[in-house]
Every structure is written in C-alpha cells, then in structure tokens.
C-alpha cells in the first residue's frame, strides 16, 4: 500500500450504521438507491446487518418470539419498497470520490456475531438438488460465541467463520434495480467464505460514490452452499473503504493475509471456473509481472480452483493462490 494511503487510513474517522427501516435495502442493488450514509475514502464504518428471514418463519421453526430482533420486526412491518430478491441488506454507503472505472477497496477489519443463533433451510424448488428434496425445511441452530462453534446436532459441532455473503456496489445505472440473489460484476451475493475478518475485497465501481450494500450474514458456510443457505445470522462488521484510482477491474477480486483470490461468475459453472482462472492469470501478469504462459502454469501447479456457490442462478468459482509463493522474489528485489 502506498504511503499516502497508509496515512489516510490512520487519520480516518469511524462511523456507526444501524439497520433500520430507513437504512435497509430489501432484495436489490440499485444505482438509483439514495445513500443512507456518506463517508470519505479511508474512513471506517461499523455496520449492523440482519438475518434474512421474517419473524413468522423463525418462530415457525421453533425460535422463541422473545429472541426475534426488534429491528427485524420493524423492517418486516414497515419496509414496503422491496424485491426482486429476498436479502435484507444495509445501505447503500456513498464513498466520496468514487467514480465509474475506479475500484472500491473494502478492508474487512472485523466480523462479529450479533445473535446467539442461526438458521439453515432449503425449499422444495431451491438448492442444488431440489429433485431429491421436494419439500421445505428450516432449522434453528444455536451458536456458541465463546467456543466459536455451531451446535448443529448432538455430537456435531461446526466451527464458525463469520462473513458477509453479500457485499457489493451499485450495478451500472442502465441495469436498473438488480436482484440481490445472483452475484455479478457489482459483487453482491458472492457467498465466498474466504471473506472473513482480515480479508480485503476489491469491487469495480459503476456509479458515483460506489454505493456499497452489505448483508446476508453467515456464521459459517461450506463451499457450494448446496442447500441454498449457510449458517444464516445477523452480523456486525467493521469495514474500511478506500477508493483506488490506480486499479481497474472487470470482476471482483480479493485477498486474505495469506492468499490472492480471483473470481468467476456465470450461469454455467464451467464458464465461471474458466473466468476465475483467466482473472488469476491477468492478476499474475499485471501485478507479479509473469508472462501469461508462466501464469497459466503457476495456476495449475499451485492454484486451488474451488466452487464458491452453485445455487444463486449465477454460479461462482474462485481460485486461491498462496502469497508465500512470491516470498523469494520479494527478497531478491530488496522488498
């Protein structure tokens, strides 16, 4: 990171953004959505998100009424401007200086559990193999914040790695209101379980201010998210936003403290996987100055090509490449 960006980050303010009927975007990404918060590049937002469900569904699955969050009741009762998707998102956040063609760097500084439960559910016509499960089922799953596990069943504990399934910016204005379910060039419902605290997401900007939305909190998830939900819950995140004029992307990209991540998105999973590989090759050629031939070979011998999700209409694939591969090259250059 350039020195000017480090100084900017150190001096940046922190904002608090609650989830209320006035700050909720139910089921869409839209360049015409009015901002609920305006911030400067380099500033941080502690943003609250809600479980994507309704009190009736949660109570129907056995959750005591007293454990339903009051904000969820308020939003379900008062938000009428909703759809076409079903996710309850917080936003959008307007980042000053962001313009189409830029990249919005989102540093995920912290992701915290907000409630002591999650749910998992599948429907009669959703998920990856609905032909095998022609009915709907929903389960409330206790979360143990101290042990950071979900008590899935007696004797079955799932480690928690909280992340936001949906983080994105406004799509191009010509796209109008976009369904929150399929991911796209704007990011959105990526459902990438690597985007935990300490990771950074890079999103191509399509509208003034970027207009960032976030939600679909997961306490954990498996790659593929095969029944259409993970450990769905409410989360609080601390996110820092930096406008990058020096980067230009066509698809979202990410990195963790130990790895680089490229992404591919397409209704055809094979084509999504091809794009993930092409994006990593482009990254290696541009940022690591490898030839395309060498980049392709490195992806094959050291890159892990994974399925992100197969249930959101637009399928997702991603490639992970360890940063440690480049340690010796850095030392030779004196970096």
Outline where the language-model segments fall.
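Alpha/propeptide regions of enzymes that mature by internal proteolysis
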Residues: 12-14, 18-24, 32-46, 51, ...
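Long, compositionally biased
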Residues: 313-335
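Short, Lys/Arg- and Gly-enriched loop/turn segments at beta-strand edges
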Residues: 52-65, 111-121, 209-219, 308-311
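Extended, compositionally biased flexible segments
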Residues: 52-53, 57-96, 102, 108
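C-terminal segment of classical bacterial N-terminal signal peptides
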Residues: 1-8
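Intrinsically disordered, low-complexity linker/loop segments enriched in Gly/Pro
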Residues: 87-88, 94, 109-196
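Short, basic/aromatic beta-hairpin or loop at an interaction surface
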Residues: 10-25, 66-84, 167-181
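Conserved mixed alpha/beta catalytic, RNA-binding, or beta-rich assembly cores of soluble enzyme
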Residues: 162-270
């Amino acid at each position: 990171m350039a020195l000017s960006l480090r100084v900017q980050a150190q001096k940046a303010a922190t904002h608090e953004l609650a989830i209320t009927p006035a700050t909720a975007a139910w089921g869409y990404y839209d360049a015409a959505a009015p901002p609920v918060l305006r911030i400067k590049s380099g500033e941080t937002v502690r943003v609250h998100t809600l479980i994507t469900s309704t009190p009736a569904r949660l109570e129907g699955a056995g959750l005591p009424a007293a454990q339903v969050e009051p904000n969820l009741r308020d939003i379900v009762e008062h938000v009428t401007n909703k759809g076409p998707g079903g996710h309850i998102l917080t936003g959008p956040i307007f980042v000053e200086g962001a313009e189409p063609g830029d990249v919005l760097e989102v540093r995920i500084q912290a992701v915290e559990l907000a409630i002591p439960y999650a749910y998992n559910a599948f429907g009669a016509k959703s998920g990856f193999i609905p032909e095998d499960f022609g009915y709907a089922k929903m389960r409330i799953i206790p979360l143990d914040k101290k042990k950071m596990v979900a008590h899935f069943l007696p004797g079955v504990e799932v480690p928690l790695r909280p992340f936001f399934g949906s983080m994105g910016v406004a799509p191009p204005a010509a796209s109008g209101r976009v369904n929150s379910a399929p991911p796209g060039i704007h990011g959105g419902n990526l459902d990438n379980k690597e985007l935990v605290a300490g990771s950074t997401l890079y999103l191509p900007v399509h509208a003034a201010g970027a207009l960032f939305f976030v939600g679909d909190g997961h306490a954990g998830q498996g790659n593929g998210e095969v029944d259409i939900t993970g450990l769905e819950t409410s989360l609080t995140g601390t996110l820092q936003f930096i406008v990058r004029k020096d980067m230009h992307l066509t698809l979202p990209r990410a990195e963790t403290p130990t790895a680089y991540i490229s992404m591919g998105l397409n209704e055809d999973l094979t084509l999504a996987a091809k794009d993930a590989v092409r994006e990593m090759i482009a990254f290696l050629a541009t940022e690591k100055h490898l030839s395309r031939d060498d980049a392709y070979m490195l992806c094959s011998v050291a890159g892990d090509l994974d399925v992100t999700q197969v249930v959101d209409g637009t399928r997702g694939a991603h490639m992970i490449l360890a940063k440690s591969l480049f340690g010796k090259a850095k030392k030779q250059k004196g970096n």
